[in-house]
């Protein structure tokens, strides 16, 4: 009975759409962050950013949800404080269903982006520096170096991380849900 009901169809659709969104964002955002962090010349600043972004990976979902609750608290949350500072009305994030897809997506991406970013950053540091030196001598901008050297070199790692993220769909615990 359940497999033929509208509820099953809705649950399957929502699960697939969320996971597709998670997979796309868990590739685009960490690759972007890894490229940006690789451009930081200060080793101390680079390591500090890596640590701050990697930290949520080690937290349980309960702790992550508490951080997000504190961030989106209707009375004292950072988001509502900023909105009210600019003259807007506070938003009841948790009582309006339209915000839940955004909240769930934000939580999942925030928790997992650090790990993925470190994997991509490790791959970027393994790219031969003579390629960048030759590109600089040929007059390539940083964007051109990223587009024609960094991203093609990351392609195998992006494919591997995509496959691993697809495998996470089949976890039976549905930790976020």
Where in the sequence are the language-model features?
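A structural signal for multi-pass alpha-helical bundles of membrane permease subunits
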Residues: 1-177
């Amino acid at each position: 009975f359940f497999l033929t009901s509208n509820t099953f169809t809705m649950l399957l659709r929502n699960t697939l759409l969320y996971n597709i969104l998670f997979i796309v964002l868990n590739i685009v955002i960490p690759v972007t962050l890894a490229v940006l962090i690789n451009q930081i010349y200060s080793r101390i600043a680079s390591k500090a950013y890596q640590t701050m972004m990697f930290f949520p990976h080690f937290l349980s979902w309960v702790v992550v949800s508490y951080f997000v609750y504190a961030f989106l608290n209707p009375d004292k949350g950072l988001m509502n404080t900023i909105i009210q500072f600019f003259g807007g009305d506070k938003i009841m994030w948790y009582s309006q269903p339209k915000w839940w897809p955004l909240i769930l997506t934000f939580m999942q991406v925030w928790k997992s982006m650090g790990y993925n970013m470190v994997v991509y950053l490790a791959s970027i540091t393994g790219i031969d520096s003579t390629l960048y030196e030759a590109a600089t001598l040929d007059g390539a901008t940083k964007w051109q170096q990223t587009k024609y050297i960094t991203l093609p070199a990351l392609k195998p790692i992006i494919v591997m991380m995509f496959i691993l993220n697809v495998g996470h769909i089949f976890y039976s615990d549905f930790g976020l849900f």
